[in-house]
A protein has these predicted regions:
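Short His-Asn-centered micro-motif
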Residues: 81, 168-170, 198-202
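Short, electropositive alpha-helical surface patch
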Residues: 132-145, 175-186
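Conserved, mostly hydrophobic/aromatic
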Residues: 123
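Acidic/histidine-rich catalytic cores of soluble enzymes
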Residues: 175-210
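Active-site groove signature of glycoside hydrolases
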Residues: 157-172
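Alpha/beta catalytic barrel-like cores
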Residues: 6-118, 128-131, 136-141, 149-150, ...
Length: 210
């Protein structure tokens, strides 16, 4: 289980050495409790939304268990994985047969985390590049960010950096890249904008790169 230490507290103060971890709970994973169930594209296309819906509901159900486990072990920071909705940018979430159950389960997960004072964040995948010169990459990046933000909306999490969606810019600095990044950023929903933070990788003039 990867461990990190964060100091940001919900009330704006500091809480040094708050223990958290990223994505996979290796203890619960041995019990097949995970939010990372997925499928390859061929399976997605062959089995359709009914199968996807079952997978998503199982992921959401286990998220509740993970949040409770975190509280039982005094862990207050959890970076969720990105796979709760496999192939989630390829369909309307409302079209999932179990959507109502999924939404309700995610709401319970969010309420539980909030009641415990846990900070939930996410780190969308490295292919999210708002400053790309390729329109398809920008379009897919926006879709992926909005999917992450929608999950947080369903959980009732704040639309602030406290519940951050952390990304890299993914390329070296230039005025053109910056302009494209801002143009793409302006297409995001207000909740997604409110959660978005850019990681400073301390390279190429302190501009975020991969």
């Amino acid at each position: 289980m990867s461990v990190l230490y964060l100091s940001i507290h919900t009330k704006g103060g500091y809480m040094p050495h708050t223990v958290g971890y990223c994505c996979i709970n290796t203890v619960l994973n041995k019990q097949k409790i995970t939010t990372g169930r997925g499928m390859i594209q061929r399976t997605f296309e062959a089995r359709g939304l009914a199968y996807v819906s079952e997978i998503v509901l199982a992921n959401a159900t286990d998220l509740v268990k993970i949040i409770q486990w975190n509280e039982d072990h005094d862990i207050k920071v959890f970076r969720m994985g990105s796979g709760i909705f496999p192939w989630g940018t390829k369909y309307n979430l409302h079209d999932l047969p179990n959507y109502t159950k999924i939404a309700n389960t995610l709401r319970i997960a969010g309420e539980l985390a909030t009641s415990f004072g846990q900070r939930i964040t996410a780190h969308p995948d490295h292919f999210v590049k708002l400053g790309s010169s390729k329109p398809a990459v920008v379009e897919n990046s926006i879709k992926d960010l909005e999917l992450h933000s929608t999950v947080f909306d369903l959980m009732g999490l704040t639309a602030t950096p406290y519940n951050a969606l952390n990304i890299h810019v993914g390329m070296n600095f230039s005025e053109e890249v910056a302009a494209r990044w801002v143009a793409a950023y302006n297409q995001l929903s207000s909740n997604c904008k409110g959660r978005l933070v850019v990681e400073n990788d301390d390279k190429a003039g302190s501009f975020s790169v991969i």
